[in-house]
Amino acid sequence: MVPEYSRFYNILGYNFKDYTLLIRALTHRSKTKKNYERLEFLGDSVLSFVIAEVLYKQFTDLAEGKLSQLRSKLVKGTTLAQLASSLKMDEYIILGASEQGGHKREKILEDVFEAVIGAIYLDSDFATVKKVILKWYQPIISSINLDTIKVKDSKSKLQEILLQNALSLPEYSIETIDGKDHEQQFTVVAVSKDLNLRVKAQGTSRKKAEQKTAEKMIEMLSQQGLHEKK
């Protein structure tokens, strides 16, 4: 065990046989060409399968569409960033000079989380990495309440509200992109011609900005008495 990583191994609940895999998983592309991107690709697939399997077995009455939405919520975005932070991954991320301070950025935390999973898989086997993933996710999965959880993303929910009321779908477009490459802010506009509505919101990616725009439009529709029909 490499001394400086012994604490991290304890937090992860896994001891690397080849610690260079862990180093690669923690290294951002701003530092070197030997970075975490390939491991991130692998870890993304491993994580998606493990979570899909546990959801399939645990929620036997849930339809395919709902399972997909729930899996998406668990393997993307804020969930991964929060898990990465809880496992102290942000304290070990290796960044180049151009990315200093980026160890708290959500996108980097998401990527590193997936890369570490890819590294554990290569360092061991599928059964081992599955066990580690389920340990990390256990508090989240055990607390899932299908009666209250929002498994539908905002764009999907908005689409259903509009279709249920025989209204055309909104058109999304990027208004502006501000900031440096690693700190971009996207401003997205959504237009509903049938309702004569124009809404805009910002996010650190186009996808996030579109979701926030959809959330705003849902709120406006709610004020007009338009809700999703159960």
UniProtKB/Swiss-Prot annotation:
GO cellular component terms, A-Z: cytoplasm
Task: List where in the cell it is found.
Answer: Cytoplasm
Give the EC number(s) under which this enzyme is classified.
Answer: 3.1.26.3
Swiss-Prot/TrEMBL catalytic activity: Endonucleolytic cleavage to 5'-phosphomonoester
Q: Which cofactor does it need?
A: Mg(2+)
- Family in the record: Belongs to the ribonuclease III family.
Write the protein's name.
Ribonuclease 3
Name of the gene this protein is made from: rnc
